[in-house]
Design a protein with these regions (language model features):
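Active-site beta->alpha loop and helix N-cap motifs at the rims of alpha/beta catalytic domains
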Residues: 1-59, 64
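Catalytic alpha/beta core domains of metabolic enzymes, predominantly
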Residues: 68-174
Length: 174
């Protein structure tokens, strides 16, 4: 079903997404090994890895091994930048050895709605006096800032927005 699009678009579309084991979130080696194994299942696999400290290390290693990673469970600009830098290091290491990166499709997914959820809880817990309407835009602000920096630095991974909570999220990202 997806393979024709994958072939036609040279790996940029037509990918099948699969998640590494969430229980490995603190185990860089385990995440990387899981991702590398999943990539052997089909040429169009996009492997999801968590943006934890261990996950970022695994993302670099898996990227180096030619795995198209979707860094997921990302909630902040600093996490998105750590992902971009890890992916760039993996791509550079791979390229330096003459290995192809042409069909790789590295992605970082920022969970905009979940970021909003966390900011609302934190604002309430810390008694921050803020217009409630602004709390629905934290994730979008995070996404837009990360996007600006990705463009400014020339980072190759694409940014995706996920976990929308309201219509404004979709309209603001598009």
């Amino acid at each position: 079903l997806l393979k024709p699009a994958f072939d036609r678009e040279r790996g940029k579309k037509g990918r099948l997404s699969i998640q590494t084991n969430p229980q490995l979130y603190r185990n860089a080696r385990g995440i990387a090994e899981h991702a590398i194994h999943f990539a052997t299942l089909a040429p169009n696999m996009q492997v999801k890895a968590p943006v934890t400290s261990a996950g970022v290390k695994a993302i670099e290693e898996a990227t180096y091994h030619g795995v198209s990673i979707n860094a997921t469970v990302c909630f902040s600009v600093s996490q998105a930048l750590a992902v971009a830098q890890a992916m760039e290091r993996g791509l550079e290491r791979r390229s330096a050895e003459g290995k192809s990166i042409a069909e790789m499709s590295p992605v970082c997914t920022i969970m905009v709605g979940r970021t909003d959820d966390w900011v609302k809880v934190a604002a309430k817990k810390n008694a921050v006096d803020i217009d409630p309407a602004f709390l629905d835009w934290a994730g979008i602000a995070c996404f837009k800032r990360a996007y600006e920096i990705y463009k400014e630095k020339g980072y190759r991974p694409r940014l995706l927005a996920a976990a929308y909570r309201h219509l404004g999220d979709r309209k603001s990202v598009v």
